[in-house]
Amino acid sequence: MKEIVLASSNKGKIREFTNIFKQKNIKILPQTDFNVSDADEIGLSFIENAILKARNCAKHTGLPAIADDSGLEVFSLNGEPGIYSARYSGEHGNDKANIQKLLAKLTGNDNRNARFVCALAYVKHEFDPAPILAYGFLEGKIAHKISGSNGFGYDPIFILPQLQKTLAEISETDKNKISHRAIALDKIMQLL
């Protein structure tokens, strides 16, 4: 069975990647199994950060690696929070504060069109000159208030127009069928 290191310590992400790659007879090994620290996300785009993370894992493990960088883009805010989605409020991983800051910035703004972005990068080794790349997008709108208890991040304020529900109001199973990450993973699986 082929092994790929996942540049993540996020348990939900590890579970999602493990289940999807198992179908291709590929074993996902989280970077935490190798005591690999998170790479510094110094890129200016999702794809740059994904490549940095994948190369960091490959460097420290000697194995092929895959990484994603994801976030939310609100069009009327010139793509904010973008690559800073997880630390939008200044504190990394504080979902509640990130949501509050975004809703405050959108007060009085009727243009709430947004999308989730997932950029994936796969490298065979640290110096791979041609990483395999894939993007996934999920279009929607930003709600005026939090709704739903499933998911994480901006899910409670991201409305799916076709369902008129937030991502936090649908099941994890349904979300994993339509999410930006699921779309990007499907694309990259076809290239591996």
UniProtKB/Swiss-Prot annotation:
InterPro entries: dITP/XTP_pyrophosphatase, ITPase-like_fam, RdgB/HAM1. Binds 1 Mg(2+) ion per subunit. The keyword Hydrolase applies. Substrate binds at residues 8-13, 70, 152-155, 175, 180-181. One of its GO terms (molecular function) is ITP diphosphatase activity. Mg(2+) binds at residues 40, 69. Pyrophosphatase that catalyzes the hydrolysis of nucleoside triphosphates to their monophosphate derivatives, with a high preference for the non-canonical purine nucleotides XTP (xanthosine triphosphate), dITP (deoxyinosine triphosphate) and ITP. Seems to function as a house-cleaning enzyme that removes non-canonical purine nucleotides from the nucleotide pool, thus preventing their incorporation into DNA/RNA and avoiding chromosomal lesions. Belongs to the HAM1 NTPase family. This is dITP/XTP pyrophosphatase.
